[in-house]
Design a protein with these regions (language model features):
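Aromatic sugar-binding surface patches on proteins
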Residues: 46-58
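Beta-strand elements of well-folded, non-transmembrane domains
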Residues: 17, 75-77, 183-187, 207-209
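...the same signal can extend to comparable exposed beta-sheet modules
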Residues: 102-109, 117-122, 134-139, 171, ...
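Surface-exposed, charged secondary-structure patches
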Residues: 1-12, 24-31, 36-42, 56-73, ...
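Short beta-strand edge/turn micro-motifs at domain boundaries
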Residues: 32-37, 42-47, 62-68, 76-97, ...
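Core segments of small alpha/beta cavity-forming domains
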Residues: 3-6, 10-16, 21-25, 68-160, ...
Length: 227
């Protein structure tokens, strides 16, 4: 995944370590090719939010905007093992990552609004961009905006989401972003038993500035979305 970073060059990590496994925390910043260490340092946390320890990395070195780097968050465990989390980072204040993530989460939430009228739904305007195109979705296991509205709202299966959504930005630049959502749902089958489904959705979205002060929808709209 990739983590957009604003010009303040601060990256924040939230760590769930209720068992106290980690003894020390540190980070490394590398060139994307992995052949040049740009900086590293130790990390401490004095902040906790919702049970997560918060670590802020303030990148000291000058890094080029719109250039990808590899950031490694490391923790050394009590058993002598080192755990590493890798992410790409890129600096740009104009990617509108927060707005795009908000849009994707709203689109996803709308697929669980089983009572909404199709034409009044949040999804409907984005389906119209694909109106008249052949439906190339394979089944309920693979849907996109050429699918019917009924399919996009789960065709009467009425699942319940039982995990938090985990969003990941896979790609991002000033033109568009690819965002992945992962979560688990459950639904009752015809035998009255519970089935469980691991869901992965992909969205290709782009940001548009609002045309008027009252036009709030296009401010977080997308030209294309796929799930």
């Amino acid at each position: 995944c990739i983590t957009p970073v604003t010009d303040d060059k601060k990256v924040t990590f939230a760590v769930d370590d209720k068992n106290g496994y980690a003894k020390t925390y540190s980070y490394e910043l590398w060139s994307i090719s992995g052949d040049s260490l740009i900086e590293n340092g130790d990390l401490t946390s004095d902040t906790e939010e919702n049970g997560y320890r918060i670590f802020d990395i303030d990148i000291r070195m000058d890094i080029k905007p719109d250039t990808e780097y590899m950031l490694i968050f490391k923790l050394d465990g009590a058993d002598g093992q080192t755990v590493r989390y890798y992410t790409r980072i890129v600096v740009n204040d104009n990617y509108h990552a927060s707005e795009l993530l908000d849009f994707v989460e709203q689109f996803n939430a709308s697929t669980f609004d089983y009572e909404a009228n199709e034409e009044g739904s949040f999804i409907y305007p984005y389906m119209q961009a694909y109106k008249g195109q052949d439906d190339d979705s394979l089944s309920m296991g693979h849907l996109n905006l050429t699918s019917s509205y009924k399919e996009l709202v789960w065709s009467g299966v009425n699942p319940v989401r039982i995990t938090s959504i985990i969003p990941q930005i896979k790609e991002i630049d000033v033109n568009y972003a690819v965002i992945e959502l992962d979560y688990v749902t459950t639904a009752e089958n015809t035998d009255g038993e519970s089935d469980y489904y691991s869901i992965r959705e992909y969205y290709r979205v782009s940001y548009k500035e609002p045309e008027t002060e009252d036009d709030t929808e296009t401010a977080t709209g997308a030209e294309d979305a796929e799930a």
